[in-house]
Amino acid sequence: GRYYVYGYGTFQGSKTQLESAITLAYDTYGTVVDCDSKSVWKRYRSTQASIDGVSPVMGGSSLENAVTTVCNYLGADYNAAAYMEQGYTAVQTMNMISGVHGISLTGITCEKALSYVGEGSLVIAKTGEDEYIIITAYNSSEIAYIESSSGSVKTMSMNDAGKMFS
């Protein structure tokens, strides 16, 4: 698809890669919209956000646990891990939920990803070779997340999170 960037009060350009559009919107204090004029990403986010009611699921790989946890939170009535074991990607697995549109982003900073949490969307972030976390909350100084390999709820300073995702 194509993404349109508005910043500094005017149209800044269009991009085919969402990551590029987010970077341009970030640099111009703007917003990214899709071809249907739906907001996809906003530079401005609230100073804190929290998504409650997320119950960690264990039993698979770190990624399977993360995707299953998010799918269950979103109301999936199927076994997400089973689909992933059949070769479905995380995004394909989430997109089977009615009204859900998962996206995959590579190379964006933690700060940019937090805009999604601020809009009420959980973020699965890769933190190592086979390690994933689910970001559930943030404030001005730290993020809260579920470590999907252990199910533990933890916090990390915004500074450390910035280093982890850079």
Report residues per predicted region.
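Short, mixed-charge low-complexity intrinsically disordered segments
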Residues: 29-45
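A short, charged, amphipathic alpha-helix used as a generic interaction element across diverse proteins
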Residues: 15-34
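Conserved active-site-adjacent core of cysteine acyl-enzyme catalytic domains
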Residues: 46-166
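Surface-exposed loop/edge segments in extracytoplasmic proteins
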Residues: 10-14, 41, 152-155
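Short aromatic-glycine-(Arg/Gly/Cys) micro-motifs in beta-strand/loop hairpins
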Residues: 1-10, 30-31
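Solvent-exposed strand-loop boundary residues in beta-sheet-rich modules
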Residues: 9, 36, 149-151
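Residue-level detector of conserved, well-ordered beta-strand and adjacent loop positions
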Residues: 6, 16, 33, 136, ...
